[in-house]
Amino acid sequence: MSDPSCELCNKILGAVVGHACGDYLGMPVEFKSKPEQVVDFFGELGIRPLTVLARGHKTAGFYTDDTAMMLCLAQSLIDKGFDTRDQFEKYKSWAFNGYMSADNKQSYGIGQNTLRKLLRQGVDNIPTKIENNNKEGGNGALMRCLPIGIVYFQEIDQVVEKSVLSALVTHNNDIAVWSTVVFNTFVSYSLKGLNKDAFLDRFFAEHFYRDLPEDIKTLLQKLQVRNEQDISNTGYSLNTLEIALVSFFSTDQLDDAIKMAIGFAGDTDTQGAVTGGLAGAYYGYNSIPNNWVESLQNREMIINIAQNLCAISSKKN
């Protein structure tokens, strides 16, 4: 493993592994619609012994589409640099052959919009501009976008450009696309070592802030005074982004942030993954409970991918 004492490596490992742990911890209670149902399973937002965190024939530590697609994007960046055609092909390989999946056999949890795009769009028809298809506002682009924020973290214009183009591979919707920009910008701030209390003011001053959809601007402007009871737990990108940011800003350590995100119920694996990725980038690998890491399926492969992302990011920056 890369030396976790190296601050940048520690943060990148934290982001990738935190994402995967948040995913598998949320998996057993995905689609429970009420927070009290999550509490019934986990117990007051604690995490039960990991051996019981299973769902059907999926064992503890089994991650879903959130992490598998994130790993596909990461490996594409490692293999080809930024290449949306290769990203598309790796997503197809996951969807139909189980590439990067937890059991290395088949995909799990693929969204209908993503499946439709992989079946019908074709690698030669990937859009490069937002056309705002209202049917493509799900969180499938947000859940996988983390590696962009890692690789390009020092170049904010590249974070924006690459986040947009990578999201458009499957999601041609302004909120779905710009949610990835917000998330990856905060990942960038985390890897740069900024204090999270300064994130929002820094973001409001970014030149691209004016381009954001109004719904995202409203979310960010109200973030620090948001009533948790008003937050929706649907699988749409805006709601998932809000849950992740509220959970991140309202807590002081990674495990509490992930538990809070899962505690909102709904699309819990994605909420846990997105929150875990950001919190991991901020607090680092050493902040993840050891038993969470030890239970993660394909742990060595995931850590190796994170190491390779660290190597690429270090060279770029």
Question: Language model features by range: what are they?
Answer:
Residues 1-317:
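Structured, active/binding-site neighborhoods that engage oxygen-rich ligands
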